[in-house]
């Protein structure tokens, strides 16, 4: 009996969150704000990638960033130097954000008027993938030192993401990491997954990623305008 109750509660939590996420997406569409949920392991280079990516995105878009961590404001302080609007979210021990937490963060950020908000989720390959934040795009980073077998071990995050960044390609010669193999493993989980090999350290590949994101955001907004016309 106890075990059945736990499963039922968990299902209810996910269902409630999914409904809240759909409402949030609709509200963001109405105000013209596109939300990206950025997920990865700790140390994969999320913040360094954003430092490279933001100046390119800011050429075309008004961008805000929400930095989620269990504690500390180091990342928010770093990102603020790019000139992007940024807030720090402390999760109080939670290993992920859900739609309700994301909504609260967007209100604090005053996201209305921004073209794009990037949520840098808590560093974790498991929990963040389980909760819909209301984002239009789930984007993940896998770094070369983590190994090319991660799609086999952590399938859900690869299944829920629309694109994967393979970061730290500048250290490929020093690690047993096969780019073709990780591509095959990842697309076994998600055949439509877009893959971008980059080096946040050198900047290699980042411009192609920025161009793809800008095109995707523009296309999404144009489709919404046509639907609402």
Show where each model-derived region lies.
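Iron-sulfur (Fe-S) cluster-binding modules
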Residues: 1-16, 23, 201, 205, ...
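ATP-dependent carboxylate-amine ligase
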Residues: 156-160, 217-224, 228-229
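Canonical P-loop GTPase G-domain recognition
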Residues: 171-224
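Residue-level signature of catalytic and energy-coupling elements of molecular machines
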Residues: 37, 69, 120, 167, ...
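Conserved C-terminal guanine-recognition region of P-loop GTPase G domains, centered on the G4
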Residues: 128-135, 142-192
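ATP-binding Walker
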Residues: 41-44, 204
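Nucleotide-state-sensitive switch-loop elements of NTP-binding domains
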Residues: 3-26, 31-36, 44, 48, ...
């Amino acid at each position: 009996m106890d075990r059945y109750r736990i499963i039922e509660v968990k299902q209810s939590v996910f269902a409630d969150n999914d409904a809240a996420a759909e409402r949030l997406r609709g509200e963001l569409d109405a105000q013209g704000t596109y939300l990206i949920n950025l997920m990865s392991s700790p140390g994969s280079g999320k913040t360094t990638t954003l430092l490279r990516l933001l100046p390119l995105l800011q050429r075309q878009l008004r961008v805000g960033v929400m930095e989620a961590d269990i504690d500390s404001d180091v990342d928010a302080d770093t990102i603020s130097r790019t000139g992007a609007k940024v807030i720090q979210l402390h999760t109080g021990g939670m290993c992920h954000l859900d739609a309700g937490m994301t909504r609260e963060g967007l209100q604090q950020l005053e996201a209305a008027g921004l073209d794009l908000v990037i949520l840098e989720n808590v560093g974790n390959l498991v929990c963040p993938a389980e909760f819909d934040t209301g984002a239009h795009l789930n984007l993940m980073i896998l770094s070369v030192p983590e190994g090319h077998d991660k799609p086999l071990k952590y399938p859900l995050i690869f299944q829920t993401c629309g694109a994967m960044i393979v970061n730290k390609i500048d250290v490929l010669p020093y690690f047993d990491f096969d780019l073709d193999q990780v591509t095959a493993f990842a697309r076994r989980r998600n055949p439509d997954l877009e893959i971008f090999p980059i080096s946040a350290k050198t900047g290699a590949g980042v411009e192609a990623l920025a161009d793809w994101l800008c095109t995707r955001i523009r296309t999404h907004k144009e489709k919404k305008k046509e639907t609402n016309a």
